[in-house]
Amino acid sequence: MSHVDDGFRSLTLKRFPQTDDVNPLLAWEAADEYLLQQLDETEIRGPVLILNDTFGALSCALAEHSPYSIGDSYLSELGTRENLRHNGIAESSVTFLDSTADYPQAPGVVLIKVPKTLALLEQQLRALRKVVTAQTRIIAGAKARDIHTSTLELFEKVLGPTTTTLAWKKARLINCTFSHPQLADAPQTLSWKLEDTGWTIHNHANVFSRTGLDIGARFFMQHLPENLDGEIVDLGCGNGVIGLSLLAKNPQAKVVFVDESPMAVDSSRLNVETNLPEAFERCEFMINNALSGVEPFRFNAVFCNPPFHQKHALTDNIAWEMFHHARRCLKINGELYIVANRHLDYFHKLKKIFGNCATIATNNKFVILKAVKQGRRR
């Protein structure tokens, strides 16, 4: 939990999920302060759009202007809602939209936290291009190290003339004026053939490893079990390649695709529809914070390639939460399978949570682990 006085409000903010007290990470950064410093309240006219507001620092500060918070993270939405409540601000003061929704027309101010991937930034800038005007004030911010020549060129290409500020507290801003430059259309998804399957995998802008199969998933797919039945989960599904493989290998099973990214869940749905349409009735698609709110003792197996970062920050909090949720939602003797980088030492974490852990396969970079839910039903 951290305190910030940004000139608009004095706020107490926390990350979601919360980090431990030993290795605390802040819920805001200098770029948030720097962005807010640029705004004279008298100049805010028309809708306020805030893109990629990780934990609500900008949305909370500008809540009286009824901003729209736009992004591709359900965790960020939950974190923003939690911080609104914690600071006594009505949740209804902020309207939440995912990045693929239609944006409000003629915004007065657009504040952008530059996302980690250029693909998501381009998708968002193209969406903004449809609604901004020459009078819209467009400001983006990030750590100085995360703003590159390619970032500036993208703003120029999609929206118009772009300048940058000096660094302040290691943060930097981008100012952009819309001039409606000529721009060729771009497809909504990036597609590629998945080797040895005949499948075409479709990826929205913010999907992990959208340009090809990541090496961890490739290794995982080589060791997925067969002949499972009941309900099984692709947790943190991304584009759904693990779930697709599970559907193909386990014709008696139902697969639940879960991710906190709406773009990921939509990519998974699209990939089942186009590659295994006959299996679509055996699928469920869920935008969620891991398995929050899912009833206990529901699943026979959970499969997970857990992230070890949240936006630009390195953290194992999300993976830790996924493992705990998996244990709660597995049936007795249900199994959790994960693939992870060897250096993350998830073996001992799983053993602490489940009381057991076995190594299924390993190579020079990755390890596949299995933990079994034991004990009596509680």
Curated annotation (Swiss-Prot):
GO CC annotation: cytoplasm
Database matches in InterPro entries: DNA_methylase_N6_adenine_CS, rRNA_m2G-MeTrfase_RlmG, RsmC/RlmG, SAM-dependent_MTases_sf, Small_mtfrase_dom
Its EC number(s): 2.1.1.174
Gene3D superfamilies assigned: Vaccinia Virus protein VP39 (3.40.50.150)
Keywords, ordered alphabetically: Cytoplasm, Methyltransferase, rRNA processing, S-adenosyl-L-methionine, Transferase
Cited Pfam families: MTS
Superkingdom of the organism of origin: Bacteria
Catalyzed reactions per annotation: guanosine(1835) in 23S rRNA + S-adenosyl-L-methionine = N(2)-methylguanosine(1835) in 23S rRNA + S-adenosyl-L-homocysteine + H(+)
Single GO molecular function: 23S rRNA (guanine(1835)-N(2))-methyltransferase activity
Disulfide bond positions: none
SUPFAM superfamilies for this protein: S-adenosyl-L-methionine-dependent methyltransferases (SSF53335)
Compartment(s): Cytoplasm
Family named by the database record: Belongs to the methyltransferase superfamily. RlmG family.
PANTHER family: RIBOSOMAL RNA LARGE SUBUNIT METHYLTRANSFERASE G (PTHR47816:SF5), RIBOSOMAL RNA SMALL SUBUNIT METHYLTRANSFERASE C (PTHR47816)
Functional note: Specifically methylates the guanine in position 1835 (m2G1835) of 23S rRNA.
Protein name as it appears in the record: Ribosomal RNA large subunit methyltransferase G
Organism of provenance: Salmonella agona (strain SL483)
Lineage, broadest ranks: Bacteria, Pseudomonadati, Pseudomonadota, Gammaproteobacteria, Enterobacterales
Chain's gene name: rlmG
